[in-house]
Each structure stands twice: as C-alpha cells, then as structure tokens.
Amino acid sequence: MNTYANIMTKSAGEMFDLCEREIDRQNEIKSTENRVGRSNCAKAIRKMEKLESILMSVPAETMFTVEGCRGDNERGWSLCNVGSIVECVVKYHLSKEKENVSKTFGSGYDFKMGCIPCEVKTSLTCNALATPSEAEFTLLVNAVGVWLIKKAEVMSCVNARGRLPFNLEAGKRIDWLSERFGLDEE
C-alpha cells in the first residue's frame, strides 16, 4: 500500500541500503526518460545521497521506527518518508534516548528540546511546506545545513509558494549538527 499510515522499523544501516537501492532504481529510470524525467531522477538521487550522509552520522545498528512508508506499487519494496527518517536522526542527536528512536505521532510538535517544543522539517532537494505548528521553533534540515527558526520568523523564510528553502540559509545555523550530517560542504 502507498500510505503515510504504514510504519517501518529498520536499522540505520538497513535504511542506508534502501537509499542505495533507490539510487540504483533512479539511475535505471533516468536512462529511459526525457529531459524533465531525467531532472526529476537527478533530484531524487541527490536527495538519497544527502539522506545517506545524514544516516552516516549515527551507528549503523541504531533502530528507527518511521511513518510514511510508500512506493510499493512502483518499486516492489517500501521506502520511508525522508522527513521521518531525518526527524529520527535529529532526535537521536538531540535527546538522551539512543535506542529504538521513533517518529512521534499526533502531539502537535515533533520533540522537545528541554521544555521547548520543536517541529522538524526536511527540505533536501525540493521545498518543504511551512505548515503551522504549535511548536516554538522549527528545526529545518536542508541541503546546506541545519537551521533553528523561531516560530514568529518561519513565514519570513518561505518563498512565494509558502515553502521553506532547500539551498539557502534560514534562521540560526546549528554548526555542529550540520557538520555531523555532512551538510557543510555546499
């Protein structure tokens, strides 16, 4: 089934392997597509490469439970939502819990940094929609870094379509996490 309600538990190493499978699949598709199709494949490949870099920041045996598994119909296997995986990796680095990290469901925010609710958004190649949140901060992981944006400032970071940037600075850069994710090379 192709639904965000599907949940998957895998190790970081297994998720890295899924990224490799998707890169191989996109490379096969790219060879048969027109210019627009090749461009879409190239974006998907870049996204998977960034995700691999982020996954390499945690031990391969770290277990993650994520929502948003989809793509069974076209792939023959499931691929998790990239944002859910990134959220788990962020939680791994910012919380005490280092085993069985899970994406949170239905709380109005993704996790708390101390007592401050925080919403995690991911925009590695295409822009994430800046949705309203109860959280005081948005933690944006994009292709050029990890950014902390105050709730009142989120809308000043979006483009005309209300999307957060994938290749621009946005808010206050969290240098140590950006470097750990390999996002300091852009």
Write out the residue ranges for each language-model feature.
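Nucleic-acid endonuclease domains
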Residues: 1-186
